[in-house]
From Swiss-Prot:
The protein's assembly and partners: The COPII coat is composed of at least 5 proteins: the sec23/24 complex, the sec13/31 complex, and the protein sar1. sec13 and sec31 make a 2:2 tetramer that forms the edge element of the COPII outer coat. The tetramer self-assembles in multiple copies to form the complete polyhedral cage. Interacts (via WD 8) with sec13.
Species for this entry: Aspergillus terreus (strain NIH 2624 / FGSC A1156)
The WD repeat ranges on this chain: 5-47, 66-109, 118-158, 163-203, 207-250, 254-294, 297-337, 381-406
GO BP, sorted A to Z: COPII-coated vesicle cargo loading; endoplasmic reticulum organization; protein transport
Membrane topology: Peripheral membrane protein
Bias (Low complexity) ranges: 798-823, 837-850, 921-939, 979-991, 1045-1064
Name of protein: Protein transport protein sec31
GO molecular function (one): structural molecule activity
Compositional bias of kind Pro residues: 942-957, 964-978, 992-1006, 1030-1044, 1078-1111
Gene that this polypeptide is encoded by: sec31
Principal subcellular localization: membrane
Length: 1247
């Protein structure tokens, strides 16, 4: 709440009508005494200047005129004859004065319009008709009620003729029916008048005829109104429906003293202001009786409050402390008030009184829903994933809305083409995709790209690339040339030409082997030759004939001994190249390479094909790639496809493409870019070809825009982007591309492609194709910052509700019930058996559920009664008697409960019920001590008393009847709980009672309050019986570290006393004063806690000088060695990361975090530490969910059900699931379970 302005007057006031800058008219309140004891009375007009930021200094009146009497009421209405309207004043001397507001502001001396003195006494109230602004109703002493017409003020007419002894204190015109008026008197009469017929319609049956100080009509329902009583003994506001005038429909109780003023907001009937003698101004929902909260408290009575008629964001409140406060209904932080409080704390001594600043008490609140004038009747917004969310009223005039989610696509063609392409990919027909895209290509470059990709799909990609370059036809032409030279003909032995075969495939064999295909005797040649191997020929020769040169002799000798390498050296030395090649063929690969090297070294001025041949033979195609003229790039590419080794092919293609790309940059020759793209495609260099494609994308997009196509710029860009993504996708599949940089966190070679993937994913996601978007985002490195954000959005948009948990029969640990009466003792599953019964620990059990539900409505409890004097221990208790007691106790547990004095809860929805959700405990300045309730013998009022033997010991508290408990607030009752074993059994007469204990703390009045700690018990004394008390959902966790054994009792239970001492009976637990607004306590005792140390059987512990030795396996103080544990493995993801939470666990994170934020925003600031601790523990749970560790799938499903129960405010189900998880799955629990438990309690206590 922001206090915008303050008018330093004790005066009644009225807001100016109309939409102009708001003004306020004030009239000195009759009977009020100013600070300076001045008796001056006047009418003043104030310009609030709400548009001004500078609010320093005190407001000064814009106009002022003295009057001869004080004001009881004032009104301001619009008028056709007066520019700024007419102001009417109800004066204490019985005069009705009218002023022209415009003349007052201008300082004119004739601002008084008229004066009427028809009233014989003081005029207490007046109001202009909201439908007819010329009609003015005035009411005052002796029941006088007049209706005046501004056109004839001197002749008003009176409603009701009989003289009355009571005074009309308030009146109000009906907001829907113009001729209906209601009045309230100090005698308790609430009368409805029909002004048209000038008679009384009906009188409400105001029980007890309590005085009425204010009345107000419902602005929308003409039959509903509210009344207020100024009595300090019974302050209340009654909501009436004229259709049942015998009793109020609802009573609103929140004020501590009489109510003096009401103001019902005309723009929102769910907002009602009330102010009164308790110095407070409250805001209500009169439709439900719920009190939203309280505005800052002042130091004296607040006698008038009014909404601004035009802008209800503002309202004003007048009080007898000499101020009229103009405030907003919006809540803001109280940093200023805190700063002043801190400053005052630093002052001491006389400086405090000299320098301390006063600040009104602040009690801020926020409206749970927006006021009606701020509500949007309709609205729409675009949602991620191709959705439009629209909101509209179900019917005109209602406040219920319908939410619709409809699919939306910016460009339907994008969605259709995306689906078509993805379906084609699933079918795997890549060739048809390439053919279709090549046919529909808009540019030659795009068509060439698709043709090359199509060539790469074939079984022999290199041959297909050569064919695409056009070298297949050139090879055929070469074969034809050989045929023309005669190399293609052959003759048989008879000299006749061979017959050629000219079949369909004959053209394919026009190389050297084709010369033998036409010889019909070719197949028998080898067989004939083999048959003639042993035949002698008539052709003798000499190895040496004497005419040989030395070189020839050396070659011959080397050949005879098989030394081909020496023979080759001689031939090369003599430059006999033909002989050298023949010898090299016989000598093997080494000789061949030597001959080739010698040959190429001699060919310095040889033709170009020789250099090409040298590169091919030497397997060094880099010379061709780096040095060949780029005009012959196709020939170079053909050579690479034909002769390059597989491991070098990609790099050779990249080098050739780089040369072509460099040529594009140096000469700006765009045609070479297509050639470079071919090389990069052939070499499967995606990072290089993508850069070209992205450059082409921008150029093609610009051309399409310049050509004036009908498509929008968005559609043009998306289609170009889609074409790029399709080419990249097909190329990756064809080339089997593997991204080796997917794990890097920066400096990616494909960085530009990743950006396009992210952009395309966003486009297809906005068209509703979330699966496709996720597919392409998965191709982007995980550590890409923009991709991570996009993935999270896609993941959230694709999340699915967790499967519903099958409802099965609840295990016994979750819903164990006992017969009505005293609960059965339940042995702990983790308590070791011992013949020694230790004293119950004095420390509270942090895992035990509370013994009673917190009561946010109960007043503070009184101090407990003084404990009874101690009683000596009887060490001679017979064992037989104790056994009889245990048998009787067990039998009593199984017997039905005795009849208790609980009041039956009622649930009346409308009449005479109390306001829901609001009952403020009295403040300290008006608090009165509550009367202590009678003590009870058991902490559970409906528990049967145990059967004892003999009269109670002296000094034992007498048994008294449990006081009746009023009905609970609306809502279903929580399920019954189990009780800890024998936690509440009273001491037997023959047993040694526990020692006297200090009074236990009372249940807190504030649902967020931290419970005061109990005084410490003696180390060896048993604690008193359990006391039902309401725990605060914001209590901090126990600070003491838990024992190493999670089933061991708390540290307080481990302390042993050297000697037992005398004990006294248990003092009765303190009970809060019976509150008529408190909810009814639970009918069943609280559930047993399987993790708490079990309470020992109810037997007197034997006398001994020290504790017994610890049992084997029991809890021992942990040593340094036992506390050393292996360091846990590092988490998979850093704390706070929520992007990897699986879909089935997402509801847990979303619902619990949202509810935690709701609680955090509404919890009292004094409990910030407790709320932050609960939030920290919930974040531990979310980290486990994000890392997918600790929690198993069934536990995650249970947690999802628990979250949905919290969302539905079904806290009993949520707590039952929580207990079940803690009971049966302790290995999955940790610190986060305490946070979940706290959230359940906080959420239940937070409105």
């Amino acid at each position: 709440m922001v206090r915008l302005r303050e008018i330093p007057r004790t005066a009644t006031f009225a807001w100016s009508p109309g939409a102009d800058s708001p003004l306020i008219a004030t009239g000195t309140r009759a009977g009020a005494v100013d600070v300076d004891f001045s008796n001056e009375t006047c009418l003043e007009l104030w310009d609030l200047g709400l548009s001004r930021e500078d609010v320093s200094g005190e407001l000064q009146p814009a106009a002022k005129i003295d009057t001869d009497s004080g004001f009881n009421d004032i009104a301001w209405t619009e008028s056709d004859d007066n520019k700024r309207g007419v102001i009417a004043g109800a004066l204490e001397n019985g005069s009705l004065d009218l002023w022209d507001a415009d003349k007052l502001l201008n300082g004119s001396s004739d601002s008084v319009i008229s004066r009427s003195t028809k009233h014989s006494g003081a005029i207490k109230a007046l109001q202009f008709n909201p439908k007819h602004s010329n009609l003015l109703a005035t009411g005052g002493a002796k029941g006088e009620l007049y209706i005046s017409d501004l056109n004839n003020v001197a002749n008003p007419y009176r409603l009701g003729t009989a003289a009355r002894a009571d005074d009309i204190e308030c009146l109000d015109w009906n907001k829907k029916v113009a001729h209906i008026l209601v009045t309230g008197s100090n005698a308790g009469f609430v009368t409805v008048w029909d002004v048209k017929s000038k008679k009384e319609s009906l009188t409400l049956n105001n029980v007890g005829r309590k005085a009425v100080s204010a009345v107000a009509w419902d602005p929308e329902k003409p039959t509903r109104l509210v009344t207020a009583t100024p009595l300090e003994s019974d302050p209340m506001i009654c909501v009436w429906d004229l259709r049942n005038s015998h009793a109020p429909e609802r009573t609103l109780r929140g004020h501590e003293s009489g109510v003096l003023s009401l103001s019902w907001c005309t723009q929102d009937p769910d907002l009602l202001l009330s102010s009164g003698k308790d110095n407070r101004t409250l805001c209500w929902n009169p439709q439900t009786g719920y009190a939203y909260g309280e505005f800052p408290v002042v130091t004296n009575w607040t006698f008038q409050t009014r909404w601004n008629p035009h802008n209800p964001n503002f309202f004003a409140t007048a009080s007898f402390d000499g101020r009229i406060s103009i405030q907003t209904i919006q809540n803001t932080s109280t940093d200023t008030a805190k700063a002043i409080a801190d400053q005052n704390q630093a002052l001491d001594g006389e400086d405090f009184f000299a320098k301390a600043q006063s600040q009104p008490q602040v009690s801020s609140f926020s409206l749970p829903k927006a006021p009606k004038w701020l509500e949007r009747p309709c609205g729409a917004t675009f949602g991620f994933g191709g959705r439009v969310v629209s909101v509209g009223l179900t019917e005109k005039g209602s406040r219920t809305s319908t939410i619709k989610i409809t699919p939306f696509e910016v460009d339907e063609a994008v969605g259709k083409s995306t689906e078509t392409f993805e379906n084609a990919l699933k079918e795997g027909d890549l060739r048809s995709i390439c053919e279709t895209r090549a046919t529909n290509a808009a540019t030659e470059e795009e068509k060439a790209d698709w043709k090359v990709i199509e060539a790469l799909i074939s079984e022999n990609p290199r041959k297909s690339l050569v064919d695409y370059l056009g070298f297949q036809d050139k090879a055929d032409e070469a074969a034809d040339s050989l045929a023309k030279l005669g190399l293609g003909k052959d003759e048989d032995v008879n000299g006749e030409p061979a017959k050629e075969s000219r079949g369909p495939g004959a053209k394919k064999h026009k190389r050297l082997q084709s010369m033998f295909d036409a010889n019909p005797e070719g197949d028998s040649f080898l067989s004939d030759l083999a048959a003639s191997k042993g035949a002698k020929t008539n052709n003798p020769f000499q190895i040496f004939n004497g005419s040989e040169s030395e070189a020839e002799k050396g070659i011959t000798r080397a050949l005879l001994v098989g030394d081909f390498e020496k023979a080759l050296d001689v031939a090369l030395k003599e430059d006999r190249m033909s002989d050298a090649f023949m010898i090299a063929i016989c000598g093997g690969q080494k000789c061949i390479e030597k001959a080739q090297e010698h040959y190429f070294s001699k060919q310095t001025d040889s033709p170009n094909y020789v250099r090409l041949l040298a590169s091919i033979v030497g397997k060094n195609l880099w010379d061709v790639v780096h040095n060949a003229d780029l005009s012959n790039w196709k020939e170079v590419m053909a050579a690479l496809c034909t002769f390059a080794e597989e491991k070098e092919f990609a790099d050779l293609c990249e080098a050739l493409g780089d040369r072509l790309e460099e040529q594009v940059r140096s000469s700006d020759e765009k045609s070479a870019r297509k050639d470079a793209s071919f090389c990069f495609l052939a070499g499967s260099k995606l990072e290089k070809v993508v850069a070209i494609w992205i450059e082409e994308l921008a150029e093609n997009e610009q051309k399409a825009i310049e050509t004036g196509a009908n498509d929008t710029t968005f559609s043009i860009h998306v289609h170009a982007l889609q074409s790029l993504i399709e080419k990249v996708t097909i190329f990756r599949q064809v080339s089997k591309f593997q991204d080796t940089e997917h794990t890097k966190d920066s400096d990616w070679k494909l960085g530009m492609l990743y950006d396009k993937y992210i952009e395309y994913a966003d486009v297809v996601a906005t068209h509703g194709r979330l699966q496709v978007a996720q597919k392409y985002l998965d191709l982007v490195p995980e550590k890409h910052p923009e991709a991570e954000i996009a993935r999270n959005r896609i993941k959230l948009a694709m999340r699915q509700a967790a499967p519903q948990r099958t409802q099965t029969t609840a295990p016994a640990t979750r819903a164990t019930r006992t017969p009505m009466g005293r609960p059965m003792p339940q042995p702990s599953a983790y308590q070791p058996q011992s013949t020694f019964a230790p004293a119950a620990p004095a420390a509270p059990n942090t895992y035990a559920p509370p013994t009673a539900a917190p009561n946010p409505y109960a007043p503070a409890a009184p101090a407990a009664a003084a404990p009874a004097p101690p009683q000596p221990v009887n060490p001679l208790l017979p064992h037989r008697r104790m056994a009889v007691f245990l048998l009787l106790l067990r039998a009593n547990n199984q017997s039905p409960a005795t009849v208790t004095t609980y009041t039956t809860a009622t649930n009346l929805p409308a009449w005479n019920d109390l306001p829901e959700g609001f009952m403020k405990p009295p403040t300290s300045r008006r608090a009165t001590p509550a009367t202590a309730a009678a003590p009870i013998t058991s902490p559970f009022p409906n528990q049967s008393p145990p059967i004892g033997h003999g009269p109670p010991p002296p000094g034992a508290p007498p048994t008294q009847r449990t006081p009746s408990v009023p009905p609970p607030p609306k809502g279903t009752a929580p399920p019954p709980r189990m009780s800890s074993p024998l936690a509440g059994a009273p001491p037997m007469a023959s047993m040694a009672p526990p020692p006297a204990a200090a009074p236990a703390p009372a249940p807190p009045a504030n649902p967020y309050a931290t419970l005061p700690q109990s005084p410490p018990m003696a180390s060896s004394m048993a604690p008193p019986a359990s006391i039902p008390r309401g725990p605060s959902p914001y209590n901090a966790p126990p600070t003491a570290p838990p024992p190493s054994n999670r089933y061991a009792p708390s540290p307080a239970a481990q302390a042993a006393s050297p000697q037992l001492q005398t004990r006294a009976p248990v003092p009765p637990p303190p009970q809060a004063a019976a509150s008529p607004y408190a909810p009814q306590p639970m009918a069943q005792p609280p559930a047993a806690n399987p993790y708490a140390p079990s309470t020992p059987p109810m037997v007197a512990p034997p006398m001994q000088q020290g504790p017994p030795p610890p049992q084997a396996g029991g809890s021992r103080p942990s040593t340094a060695n036992s506390q050393r544990k292996a360091a846990p493995p590092p988490p998979k993801y850093p704390p706070g990361d929520r992007s990897h939470i699986p879909a089935e666990a997402m509801p847990v994170f979303e619902i619990l975090s949202a509810d935690m934020q709701r609680v955090k925003s509404r919890a009292p600031s004094s409990f910030k530490a407790q709320v932050d601790d609960a939030e920290r523990r919930l974040n531990i749970l979310f980290d486990h969910l994000n890392n997918e560790d600790l929690l198993k799938p069934n536990t995650i499903a249970d947690m999802a059900e628990l979250a949905r129960a919290i969302q539905a405010r079904d806290y009993d189900t949520a707590r039952a699931i929580h207990v079940d998880i803690m009971t049966n799955r302790m290995d999955e629990c940790g610190q986060w379970m305490v946070g979940v438990k706290r959230l359940i309690s906080m959420s239940r206590a937070t409105p």
